[in-house]
Amino acid sequence: MYKLVASDLDETLLADDHHVPGRVRRAIAAARERGVRFVPCTGRPADSVGVTLEELGLAGSEKNYTLSFNGGCLTRNSSAEPLTSCSLPFGRACQIYAKGVREGVCMHVNTLGPVYLYNYVPEERVYIQGRMNIVETTEPTLDFLAGQTVVKIVFMSLSMSHLERIEKSMRETGITEGLDVYYSGNRYLEFNAPGVNKGAGLMGLAARLGIAPKETIAIGDNSNDVSMIRAAGLGCAVANATDEAKAAADYVCEADNNTGAVAEVIEKFVLGA
């Protein structure tokens, strides 16, 4: 019997309108009535998940959790105070930021407070408007955050080939050595602290709750979800997932994020079990 379902948000749990489809809400509610925990697991900051938690009836719950920053931060849904968190070495963060400035990309610099946006292009404004605590910056270096925690840095481009070229260059010059680097959302290249991934975050939470790995389900769509898809007892990829995510999965959904993929998994493996 599965006791915990962890799901990515964007392009997995959420439809393209950034809301949870009704079928998915009903399936999650039914699973919770059976005592199964539902855990959002996102690359975004925890404070960007509030609307989703409200839609799922999980907001303010002391007994429920959210994994954010690709599993690098664990919070109770009743508090913004992290139970666990990780950070990039500041020197490495400075190198990544400098590369982003040279490349002219839009950058998210995630802290335990605001998300600092460099080169905040119109396409990104439309995409994330109202979902994060944003502070715009034009600073040419990361010195303005000296002494603060930088959780991760994200490069944004609508050209994945552009991001792939940048990542290859950074790998060849050693800037990303030892870091956990992922693509997500078909527009992001994410740089995380060593050992930070959704799989590790999920297994850490399961251990905290006394849940065995084989009793967990993970659902995702992109490269930053692969670690939890592999780590879970049942790893699932939505129909709109990347080939990499589908190859890692035990089960590939017929439905995509708009037609209730998360509900499909819960109905088949939790409610139908």
Predicted regions and their residues:
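Asp-based phosphoryl-transfer active-site loop
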Residues: Y2-D16
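Conserved acidic, metal-coordinating active-site core of Asp-based
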Residues: K99, E103-I219
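Active-site phosphate-binding/coordination module
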Residues: G22-E124
